[in-house]
């Protein structure tokens, strides 16, 4: 869970400059408050800042400025930006960063489904998890096969027969053998209901990962807005005052944006972990029932 949380946090921040600030804050606070018992927290902030820095370079944003269009950025740095890898920064008409967020979400959910399948098999046995195996085989296997087909690793003929075999095996597991020993017609009805819940649930879960792109985009646009406001102040024909107000606006704006971005980058990855991931991994929470009102003698 840790690597995915760091990646999600960094994508929500989406700015290499903010990553540097977080690392500097973590380093300063760790040196300043060595005996406070918060060393692990500052180390975590440092790791999150480091991931934010590298992901921010990959996404092409530095303190709200686009690295691709910046005159000060060297060519090797621009080559790291994913938007420059595709024409107009889009894949099939969609922003490449949005596609990246959805792809990472699919990977996250597939990992959860594999863990669910293995754990349920250990707990309940294979005979009671046939349907779970069918869905995992269909979704995870389908994604792998389609990816190999798109990369032309599989020929068109092989791709067709592998998809047919995958669909046939998964269909039998989901609709016919989902509960061995039960009436096949009941199994088919149960499989149809399970299919409805699975399709609608997975669609919502995958689309939920678009928030990684949306939060990063919002933070970048807000940072750019403060940059524009600061440069507009420089047009005031008062040599010293304009620079003072420009610096104040830039510092205030980016501090505010950093604080709001950190809040969103902390909350939303937690939601993706506790809702989308735990649900698809079959995690069942434990705990004591809350019962504050009791009779005492």
Which residues fall in each region the model found?
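Conserved, carboxylate-rich catalytic/transport cores that coordinate ions
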Residues: 1-297
């Amino acid at each position: 869970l840790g690597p995915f949380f760091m990646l999600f946090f960094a994508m929500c921040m989406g700015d290499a400059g903010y990553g540097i600030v977080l690392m500097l804050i973590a380093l300063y606070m760790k040196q300043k408050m060595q005996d406070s018992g918060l060393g692990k927290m500052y180390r975590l902030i440092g790791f999150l800042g480091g991931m934010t820095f590298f992901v921010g370079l990959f996404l092409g944003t530095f303190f709200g400025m686009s690295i691709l269009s910046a005159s000060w950025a060297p060519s090797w740095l621009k080559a790291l930006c994913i938007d420059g890898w595709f024409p107009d920064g889009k894949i099939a008409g969609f922003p490449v960063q949005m596609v990246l967020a959805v792809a990472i979400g699919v990977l996250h959910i597939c990992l959860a489904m594999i863990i669910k399948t293995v754990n349920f098999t250990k707990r309940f046995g294979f005979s009671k998890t046939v349907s779970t195996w069918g869905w995992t085989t269909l979704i995870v296997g389908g994604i792998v096969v389609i990816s190999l087909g798109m990369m032309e690793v599989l020929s068109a003929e092989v791709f067709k027969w592998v998809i047919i075999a995958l669909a046939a095996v998964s269909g039998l597991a989901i609709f016919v053998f989902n509960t061995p020993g039960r009436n096949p017609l009941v199994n088919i009805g149960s499989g149809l209901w399970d299919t409805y819940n699975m399709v609608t649930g997975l669609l919502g879960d995958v689309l939920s990962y678009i928030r990684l792109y949306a939060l990063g985009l919002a933070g970048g646009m807000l940072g750019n807005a403060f940059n524009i406001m600061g440069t507009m102040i420089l047009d005031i024909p008062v040599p010293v005052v304009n620079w003072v107000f420009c610096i104040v606006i830039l510092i205030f704006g980016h501090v505010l944006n950093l604080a709001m971005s950190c809040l969103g980058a902390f909350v939303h990855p937690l939601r993706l972990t506790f809702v989308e991931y735990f649900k698809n991994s079959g995690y069942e929470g434990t705990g004591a029932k809350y019962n504050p009102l009791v009779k005492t003698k």
